[in-house]
A protein has these predicted regions:
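Radical SAM enzyme [4Fe-4S]-AdoMet core and its adjacent flexible, acidic
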Residues: 2-7, 27-38, 42-172, 176-182, ...
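Short beta->alpha connector loops
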Residues: 12-18, 78-82
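Residues that form or immediately flank small-molecule/cofactor binding pockets and catalytic motifs
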Residues: 16, 38, 105-107, 197, ...
Length: 313
């Protein structure tokens, strides 16, 4: 249904049952597949609450590669518990000839989370600098622009404003399994409509959607997720090309990396301003605290637990 219509189709998965994707990758090898991988061995397993998750994901990814998958990769959520693994994870992905994408902790109704914070913001931000430098050293254009995305991650981690304004509800939307269409998956108040009751055009051209797009312009969340940030980087006239600001940043700093010169991060990021969080209890890992029983929700159930304020700063 979607393959002939979507320019890019991505399946994001925990990677624990890669065999379920084999038939898709065989038939549609250009389908983008990303497995969540938060670190090596026990680091990944503890963060994600998985038994032998690291080994299963890597083996599954290699199997999809054998079957002819052309756009395969891992994705990591940068945080205190895995930051020292991130550069090595990137190099590991390079060795396996698969992609590597990053994001950082976010709070959102979709995730049922409002206590995700980076505890040592400065330490984590400085480690991301190393990842940016490594990406700029490669010969892959995609990695150069991922380096810019990671510059935006540093701003997010430090609590600064976004590098580029958000375009939620205009350039992208979030559709949940029950056909509700949201401008994004962070704010539950940005519900645009429902595809069971309305057509796509009715939803996107409605007065409610225009009102929500105005709310997005005033949003102070400062999220920086890969998919949404990448969309905001695109040139509105020629979507296949980047906007001028990220383009020239990449040109200048790729040249510096090629010549062996350091990237002047202090020129782009104000490290003198770091948001100080209220005292937040450190998160427990699922494998350290309890066993979580997963189950499927029905359409009639309440799907999201709105627990307090969702804030990303």
């Amino acid at each position: 249904l979607l393959h002939p219509k979507g320019r890019i189709l991505e399946i994001s998965s925990n990677g624990l049952h890669a065999e379920r994707l084999e038939s898709i990758v065989k038939k549609y090898p250009r389908t983008k597949v990303r497995f969540s991988l938060e670190g090596f061995g026990d680091t990944n397993n503890r963060i994600r609450g998985e038994q032998d998750g690291f080994a299963k994901k890597v083996a599954g990814m290699m199997r999809l590669k054998e079957l002819g998958g052309q756009d395969l990769g891992f994705g990591a959520v940068i945080q205190d518990d895995n930051i020292t693994d991130v550069v090595d994870l990137y190099k590991f992905a390079q060795e396996k000839d698969v992609e590597f994408a990053t994001s950082t902790l976010h709070n959102a109704f979709q995730f049922h989370k409002n206590d995700n914070v980076v505890y040592d913001r400065m330490k984590v931000a400085r480690e991301v600098e190393k990842l940016i430098t490594e990406m700029l050293k490669t010969n892959k254009v995609k990695n150069w622009f991922r380096a810019y995305l990671n510059l935006g991650l540093i701003e997010n981690i430090l609590g600064h404003d976004r590098l580029i304004p958000c375009t939620a509800g205009k350039d992208f939307t979030f559709i949940d399994p029950w056909c509700d269409v949201y401008a994004c998956n962070v704010r539950p108040d940005l519900l645009l409509g429902n595809l069971r009751r309305q057509s796509w055009d009715e939803i996107m051209n409605s007065p409610k959607s225009r009102e929500i797009r105005e709310k997005v312009k005033a949003c102070k969340q400062n999220c920086w997720m890969v998919t949404t940030a990448r969309t905001a980087m695109r040139n509105p006239l020629v979507p296949q090309l980047p906007k001028a600001r990220p383009f020239w940043w990449v040109v200048v700093n790729k040249a510096r990396a090629t010549l062996g010169m350091p990237i002047p991060f202090a020129k782009y990021i104000d490290y003198g301003v770091v948001v100080t969080d209220e005292s937040v209890p450190r998160r427990e890992h699922f494998l350290d605290s309890k066993q979580v029983k997963r189950r499927k929700q029905t359409a009639e159930e309440t799907h999201y637990s709105f627990v307090g304020k969702y804030f990303n700063r």
